[in-house]
Swiss-Prot record:
NCBIfam families assigned to the protein according to its UniProt record, in alphabetical order: L12
One protein family per Pfam: Ribosomal_L12
Family recorded in the similarity comment: Belongs to the bacterial ribosomal protein bL12 family.
Recorded name of the encoding gene: rplL
Annotated protein name in UniProt: Large ribosomal subunit protein bL12
Molecular function GO labels: mRNA binding; structural constituent of ribosome
Length: 122
């Protein structure tokens, strides 16, 4: 009796997971092989894990600096907040813009730094 690949697959499909695991172990022992997926060897670790470029940035006001009034005006212009909200944000510091493009983040940072603020882009 000749076993075809199809018959072998059908026989394996009828087995439980534990029985299949025992079968795999027996095949590994018999033929001296491993059922582990082959690992590709790369030239460098950096090439193996490509770095994703950040696309969304957060602009955070760290410090208002000496020109507080100018910074409040800049915060209002950038965020669209009212005078009181802009003043509170300027005094406390915090996130000005979230999930903005790199260009937008750099523009906001430039405007606020021109007004005298310390700004961080993450």
């Amino acid at each position: 009796m000749s076993l075809t690949n199809e018959k072998i697959v059908e026989a394996i499909a009828e087995k439980s997971i534990m029985e299949v695991m025992e079968l795999v172990k027996a095949i590994e022992d018999k033929f001296g092989v491993s059922a582990a997926a082959p690992v590709m060897v790369s030239g460098s670790a950096a090439a193996a894990a490509p770095v994703e470029e950040q696309t969304e940035f957060t602009v955070t006001l760290k410090e208002a600096g000496a020109k507080k009034v100018e910074v409040i005006k800049a915060v209002r212009a950038v965020t669209g907040l009212g005078l009181k909200e802009a003043k509170d944000l300027t005094e406390a510091g915090g996130i000005l813009k979230e999930a903005v493009s790199k260009e937008e983040a750099e523009k906001v940072k430039k405007e606020l730094e021109a007004a005298g603020a310390t700004v961080e882009v993450k």
